[in-house]
Curated annotation (Swiss-Prot):
HAMAP family: Ac_ald_DH_ac. It catalyses: acetaldehyde + NAD(+) + CoA = acetyl-CoA + NADH + H(+). The active site is at residue 126. It comes from the Bacteria. The keyword Transmembrane helix does not apply. It comes from Mycobacteroides abscessus (strain ATCC 19977 / DSM 44196 / CCUG 20993 / CIP 104536 / JCM 13569 / NCTC 13031 / TMC 1543 / L948) (Mycobacterium abscessus). It is an enzyme of class 1 (oxidoreductase). Its EC number is 1.2.1.10. This is Acetaldehyde dehydrogenase 2. The lineage of its organism: Bacteria, Bacillati, Actinomycetota, Actinomycetes, Mycobacteriales. The keyword Iron-sulfur does not apply. NAD(+) binds at residues 6-9, 157-165, 284. Pfam families: AcetDehyd-dimer, Semialdhyde_dh. One of its GO terms (biological process) is catabolic process. Belongs to the acetaldehyde dehydrogenase family.
Length: 311
């Protein structure tokens, strides 16, 4: 496999592959800055590198053996990379908000996309990976007419790629809340928290529902958190799921075809990073790289899981 993007996300993903994966191996690390720490670390670890971007990757001798390519660049760059790589029959895992391919949130729809043979899978956003499982957990037991998520991350964990993709973050996450999470309408907000010491990633999920059994929703949410934590150990519920009666009309938030709202469900999450390359407060980046690694390994197992997967 290869990683395009030698910044924080790409480098953390490389470290995860080397340390954690038994069925993936690093074939190449691709960047555009020959002085980047990510390329230097890759070289020290014996990984082939190029600072010539996707063109450099295509011309590397390892390219023929690469089956899966992670793209950890930016939304605009991924669109260019996907077009350039299209003739080569590679499977792409997109860690940008470009959404060239279908949205993937592993515990919700990964199996379906692997079965369909999709070759470009989009990992939505860090906020999407943290919150869409919760929206789905609620919507699978009670219709969600509106869902709103707020992702609060440390400013120190927001590199140039994250900052350049703020608009794409909100748009992509909101669409995925609807298409993957199952809400009739979705909204996403991101907050860059400048506090020092840097805080852990915090996520808030609000779902508007009709009359529903609180115990059923609570159990569904806890089951989903347990599932996500199998590949993101630092993913946890910060406090009990809360239910508030809605008495005022919510017409401004609802679409015409949605039903009656009687209850607001509030879920408060915390994501602590594993500290493989990035500090533990960068849970927003850790959940993306962990979800991407889980996706790649699942793609391989969906083929022939009895064999080790090479480059």
């Amino acid at each position: 496999m290869a990683i395009i993007g030698s910044g924080n996300i790409g480098t953390d993903l490389m470290i995860k592959v080397i340390r954690r994966s038994r069925i993936l191996s690093m074939g190449a690390m691709v960047g555009i800055d020959p002085t980047s720490d990510g390329l230097a670390r890759a070289a020290r670890l014996g990984v082939a590198t190029t600072a010539d971007g996707v063109e450099g990757l295509i011309h590397m001798e390892q390219f023929a053996e690469v089956a899966i390519i992670f793209d950890a660049t930016s939304a605009a760059t991924h669109r260019e990379n996907a077009a350039r790589l299209a003739p080569y029959d590679k499977r792409l895992i997109d860690l940008t908000p470009a959404a060239v391919g279908p949205y993937v949130v592993p515990p919700v729809n990964l199996g379906a996309h692997i079965a369909s043979g999709a070759t470009n899978l989009n990992m939505v956003t860090c906020g999407g990976q943290a919150t869409i499982p919760i929206v789905h957990a609620v919507s699978r037991v009670a219709p969600v007419v509106y869902a709103e998520i707020v992702a609060s991350i440390s400013s120190r964990s927001a590199g140039p790629g994250t900052r350049a993709n703020i608009d794409e973050f909100t748009e992509t996450t909101a669409r995925a809340i609807e298409q993957v999470g199952g809400a009739a309408r979705g909204k996403a907000i991101i907050v860059l928290n400048p506090a020092d010491p840097p805080p852990l990633m915090r996520d808030t999920v609000f779902c508007l529902v009709g009359d529903a059994d609180h115990g059923t929703i609570r159990r569904s949410v806890k089951e989903m958190i347990a599932e996500v934590s199998t590949y993101v150990p630092g993913y946890r519920l910060k406090q009990d799921v809360q239910f508030d009666r809605v008495d005022e009309p919510m017409r401004a938030l609802l679409r015409d075809t949605t039903g009656t709202v009687t209850t607001k469900v509030s879920v408060f999450l915390e994501v602590e990073g594993a500290g493989h390359y990035l500090p533990s407060y960068a849970g927003n980046l850790d959940i993306m790289t962990s979800a991407a690694l889980h996706t790649a390994e699942s793609m391989v197992r969906g083929g022939d899981s009895s064999q080790e997967f090479g480059i």
